[in-house]
Amino acid sequence: MAKIIKFDQEGRNAFLKGVNTLADAVKVTLGPKGRNVVIEKSFGAPLITKDGVTVAKEIELDDKFENMGAQLVKEVASKTSDVAGDGTTTATVLAQAIYRQGAKLVAAGHNPMEIKRGIDKAVETLVAELKNISKPIKDHKEIAQVGTISANNDKTIGDIIAEAMEKVGKEGVITVEEAKAMETTLETVEGMQFDRGYLSPYFVTDPERMEATLENANILIHDKKISNMKDLLPVLEQTAKSGRPLIIIAEDIEGEALATLVVNKLRGVLNICAVKAPGFGDRRKAMLEDIAVLTGGKVISEEIGFKLENTTMDMLGQAKKITVDKDNTTIIDGAGSEAEIQGRVKMIRAQIEETTSDYDREKLQERLAKLVGGVAVIKVGAATEVEMKEKKARVEDALHATRAAVDEGIVPGGGVAYLRAMSALDSLDLSTEQQFGVNVIKRALEEPIRQIAQNAGVDGSIVVDKVKNGKDAFGYNAADDEYVDMIQAGIIDPTKVSRSALQNASSIAGLMLTTEAMIADKPKEEGSMPAMPGGMGGMGGMGGMGGMM
């Protein structure tokens, strides 16, 4: 297929137009007085949102080159959302500012490669300075403040998230669901969740929610594949006699064994569910052992002399309730002894201390969370479905932000942290061309606070100037239109969010600045309309109708 190629300034101008179109739609949502964006849906009511990444994801432009620019900035928003869960609008505003300033310099004849090097060095310095400014989160109140700010100044949501974290610990599992009522509530349950769902949808007990729920269930834990029905028969017969539900967790269940379980479930002979074991290799064995300790059962493994066909009921674990959907299994209130669980926790903590691998440490912490944490469910209520979707998205954002704050600490919010970190750039000793890159970043760092002020109906330049002349956490509270100490006023951002937004924005903007040629498919030309078919006899085509008047 034929291609169109654009070079130099022509291509950059098209890029810039696309970047501006997307960023201008996203940045109206920034800050406490940011506006909503309404998105048409092909079915159902329109979606109303104030979430930057949701707006960005909906944007596709007609012009292929402009669309390239828009899609690259969309990547900034979605990457920031993936890493930090919030800060998507800030990242978009930064990307637009960096590219816009950089494109002017390139158009004036400066070297884009040197500008990019300057940008990279500036961002590296800023990230170190943000970590330096950062304070660890100390208490319930600060967690609530982070949640409140991220949920668009909704204090109720901030308080609920802080309460959830307090109940299940920062390592517990918190999920967000839609409530049937108008109120937003918190439900907490002790339990362990792992990312494996049912092996067949026929195990579902609640077709509407596509979930299998087993109460007072036995748990068979096996570390190998089960494909032969004969091995399972003894334990199934004992289960049928006991009348209790059974969940089987094994490396895999396939063929004849799975088919038999499904048939027995459909006939109502057994209330049963089958799930793949979580993890891989040695980690899978360890996780199965965790489940066994939590539920008071044993891992049926030939390595320790247990065979599947010889399994007895006392080897099975037990739990008050098990919920399985297509992606996750949650075991609530396992029957394991407290002493054994604490022994297991102690062992995992010792392994965390000893390991030198970051990856292993992360996985061990996940296992620890599943043993000591619980499961908290935030049920989001609203008057209408449209409002519920918008509110649920805000709760999810706030949840990500609070987790990020617990991970890396907090900095003053409202764009103040960027202005305070800016002083670290004065110590950089770079070539003239690279210094231009640093200047681009300096100007871009003012953009979030300028946009927050503009969305609040105030002159952004005056606010930036006043905050720059202040010290420490002094900043502009757009919600109340006053200058305050941001930390004391509870206007705080997670360091991880501020850092990720800056890193992702500068990464994509830098790549766009150093792009010299753009290639896109040539649009197909619309062929001329085919002639209309001949009319009825003697009419000489439909045009002949004119003579009939």
Swiss-Prot record:
Q: Name one GO cellular component term.
A: cytoplasm
* Gene3D superfamilies with a match to the protein in the record: GroEL, GroEL-like equatorial domain, TCP-1-like chaperonin intermediate domain
State where ATP binds.
29-32, 50, 86-90, 414, 477-479, 493
**Subunit structure and binding partners:** Forms a cylinder of 14 subunits composed of two heptameric rings stacked back-to-back. Interacts with the co-chaperonin GroES.
Q: Which GO terms describe its biological process?
A: protein refolding
What gene is this protein translated from?
groEL
Q: What is this protein called?
A: Chaperonin GroEL
Q: GO terms for molecular function, please?
A: ATP binding; ATP-dependent protein folding chaperone; isomerase activity; unfolded protein binding
Q: Give the organism, scientific name.
A: Geotalea uraniireducens (strain Rf4)
Q: What is its EC number?
A: 5.6.1.7
